[in-house]
Amino acid sequence: MSRKYFGTDGVRGKVGTFPITPDFVMRLGYAAGRVLTRMDHHLVPGTKPLVIIGKDTRISGYMFETALVSGLCAGGVNVRITGPLPTPAIAHVTRAQRAQAGIVISASHNPFDDNGIKFFSAQGTKLPDEVELAIEAELDQPMELVPTEQIGRVKRIDDAAGRYIEFCKSTFPNALDLRGLKIVLDCANGATYHVAPPVFHELGAEVISIGTQPNGLNINLNVGSTHPESLQQAVVEHQADLGIAFDGDGDRVVMADNQGQLLDGDQLLYIIASHRHQRGRLGGGVVGTLMTNLALEHALGKEGIPFQRAKVGDRYVLELLNANEWQLGGENSGHILCLDKHSSGDGIIAALQVLHALRASGLSLADWAKRLPLYPQVLINVKVAQRIDLDSNTALQAAVTSAEGALKGTGRVLLRASGTEPKIRVMVEGQDRPLVQRLAEEIAAVVQQEAAS
């Protein structure tokens, strides 16, 4: 069944453009409340479902928080609001409070004038497809206020940030600390701005913070994991041991070594996996995505670590991890899931697992990076006016086959349609950068030619 509103990560778009409008968000809250009330069979008769609401630091978050609360209460749901907190913090609070669902108001790494609504289940995971479809169906029904005595109540959880800080610290071994480490933290002027610095400071690190002055308009603006240049520069200027950058809602992380060299999600995933494997604590294999660098797959294979690829998106990484009963997976963008530590991807917790590996091994971040030199990877986004069937187009298939022959088994070619934009993504990777660049450009030219025909 097709979806009208929900994408792979909730509802997202430009503020003021449908569906990211106050009236729709209020209706979304009402619809979610009605569905949760009908579906939760564990409620004590006469009690109401409980929903946790958090947000990042976008100025529109206040407006949408009020709209959601109004809709949920009108549907007979009690609400607890946390204020600005990372997306994974809401997953944690939802589980800890035994709530029926959690809702995050965020557009992740997007600019401030975007926003979105995403849901967590009672288990702190993405909502099942059938629940999202039920909410969409309810959205098409008229709003009918519950009887006055059944209207929900709203309260604030004043200590939500402190609870989450302690939860993050609990994922780092008690026998280790971060004393002697100078760390630059880039919080993207986003949801981690007031929780990440205390976590690393209380574990003993000397913390230098940037991107911790949100004003509602500067989230992800030239800072954070999607703009790591500020982090790299700050690490060098402060002669820090390493740097850590999060995205606006705190579920992504990238790091920089003491020379300011960037490590992406693939490299961080390797550090965690290799360290755990050496100590017999990996708990199975590792899940990446179609975009995961081939060097990671090869490096894990040499260490005897199973590796599988999921579709792009942390939702699909989680699905494959659960299917295999594995614990560790992630994306090169910095979404890293450590399911033995948390139910969802968490930038702070992922960074702590990397630091655990550094402390336990005695190696620096630069030392670890040398163990996984990434293969050159060229990605070209080709705008297309009309949809192209990538599987049946003979010209494209011939171009891909020719490129794979030129790589001689030392690389990969990937063609995929963007899920959010009218683009075809052409990715070629291998060990010979000039060859990879040429092959990617040749395939992109064929895509353009076929799109125009």
Curated annotation (Swiss-Prot):
Its EC number is 5.4.2.10. Activated by phosphorylation. The active site is at S108 (phosphoserine intermediate). The modification Phosphoserine is found at S108. Keywords: Isomerase, Magnesium, Metal-binding, Phosphoprotein. SUPFAM superfamilies: Phosphoglucomutase, C-terminal domain, Phosphoglucomutase, first 3 domains. Binds 1 Mg(2+) ion per subunit. GO terms for biological process: carbohydrate metabolic process; peptidoglycan biosynthetic process; UDP-N-acetylglucosamine biosynthetic process. Its cofactor is Mg(2+). GO terms for molecular function: magnesium ion binding; phosphoglucosamine mutase activity; phosphomannomutase activity. Mg(2+) binds at S108, D247, D249, D251. It comes from the Bacteria. GO terms for cellular component: cytosol. Pfam families: PGM_PMM_I (PF02878), PGM_PMM_II (PF02879), PGM_PMM_III (PF02880), PGM_PMM_IV (PF00408). It catalyses: alpha-D-glucosamine 1-phosphate = D-glucosamine 6-phosphate. Catalyzes the conversion of glucosamine-6-phosphate to glucosamine-1-phosphate. HAMAP family: GlmM_B. NCBIfam families: glmM, PRK10887.1. Belongs to the phosphohexose mutase family. This is Phosphoglucosamine mutase. It comes from Methylobacillus flagellatus (strain ATCC 51484 / DSM 6875 / VKM B-1610 / KT).
